[in-house]
Every structure is written in C-alpha cells, then in structure tokens.
C-alpha cells in the first residue's frame, strides 16, 4: 500500500542528517546505511549510499530517475544460483 500524500516520504533521521551535512559541506563520500525502507528524495541525488543486503553493504550511486523509489529496491538480498540439475545420476 502506498504512503498517504498528506505525509512526507519516510527517510531515516540519521541518514537524512548525514546527507544534509554533506550537502552543506559540498562533499561526496560513501554513506553506509541499514535503512532499506527509506525513500530516495531529491537531496540524495549525486551521493553514493552503501545499502545493507543482509551480508554486506552494496554502494549505489543515486541518480535523478531513482527519486521516489526505496533504497532497498536497488540492493538485492539474495542471489539466484539456478535450479538443480535434472541429471539422472544425481537422483540415484
């Protein structure tokens, strides 16, 4: 279900403060976050955010077409390794 338009998009407070601080200093550095549910807002464009996948942090460069999406959409939490072989020898 989509978030109500009356409310602002959800962004974790600590993530928002880190991005705001970097924008004031006009610096670019990798921001590490565990907040996969945070919405990408326009002030994040141009930053690299390392999103937690459950095992590691995956650095993602935020571009303007990503605004409005969640951070977790760009960092997959699992790797599909393929289905089991349909080899007769493996069943015996």
Curated annotation (Swiss-Prot):
Q: Where in the cell is it found?
A: Plastid
Looking at the UniProt record for this protein, which Gene Ontology cellular component terms does it annotate, in alphabetical order?
mitochondrial small ribosomal subunit; plastid
Q: Could you tell me what this protein is called?
A: Small ribosomal subunit protein uS19c
**Which Pfam families does the UniProt entry name for this protein?**
Ribosomal_S19
A molecular function GO annotation: structural constituent of ribosome
The similarity annotation says: Belongs to the universal ribosomal protein uS19 family.
Where would one find the signal peptide in this protein? Answer: none
- Entry keywords, A to Z: Plastid, Ribonucleoprotein, Ribosomal protein, RNA-binding, rRNA-binding
What this chain does, per the entry, is described as: Protein S19 forms a complex with S13 that binds strongly to the 16S ribosomal RNA.
Q: Which GO terms describe its biological process?
A: ribosomal small subunit assembly; translation
């Amino acid at each position: 279900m989509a978030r109500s338009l009356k409310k602002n998009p959800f962004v974790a407070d600590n993530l928002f403060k880190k991005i705001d601080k970097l924008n004031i200093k006009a610096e670019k550095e990798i921001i590490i976050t565990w907040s996969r549910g945070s919405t990408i807002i326009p002030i994040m464009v141009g930053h690299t955010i390392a999103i937690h996948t459950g095992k590691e942090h995956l650095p993602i460069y935020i571009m303007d077409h990503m605004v409005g999406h969640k951070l977790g959409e760009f960092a997959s939490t699992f790797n599909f390794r393929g289905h089991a072989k349909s080899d007769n020898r493996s069943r015996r």
